[in-house]
Amino acid sequence: GTLTARTLAAAIGRSHEDGLAPLDYHLDLIYDLLARVLKQSGKHDPLPFEPALWADLDLMLTDAFVLLSAHLAAGRVNPETLHSDWKIKPGSVDLSTALDQAASSGDIDTALGRLRPVHQGYTDLRDALARLRELKAAGGWPTVAARQTLHPGDHGPAVGDLRFRLLASGDADLTGRIDDLLYFDSRLAAAVKRFQ
């Protein structure tokens, strides 16, 4: 019904949390069809909606679920198209079973969650993406106004900008004593290496 359609549309909308583009999964068309179905369902006609409209919505939802599931399970880009000698093979996933389970339980989020990679690297990437989006929403990265390449031993406002920028990315810290925030010391050099 429309509750499941809205639940799937919301899950597609959150696919950006996995680094995916929600519009790649027909989100705009799904919302358009869903609005038309809901509008027709509100009428008091003996036949309150067109079956073809429901069929279109069902097809779009099914295709979106299967495509999103495939991308969550195996990635959006086939690595063999980038590197012909790629050795890592993704695990096989039965997308029709995933669709059946999601449809029968109505728990779209759990069904999609089971398809995500379970290794820590994937979780770390999702967390980093969330932090970057928060940083962007807050105005973005602090800029480093350096006119030339900075080196250990340099001193000046650009060094302070660099230190602040590396603090924002989590690559530098202010624990311990720093005598001069504008001095490019060994701790800042180590932070630059971590960042790189």
Where are these regions (language model features)?
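Auxiliary tRNA-acceptor-end handling modules of aminoacyl-tRNA synthetases
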Residues: 1-195
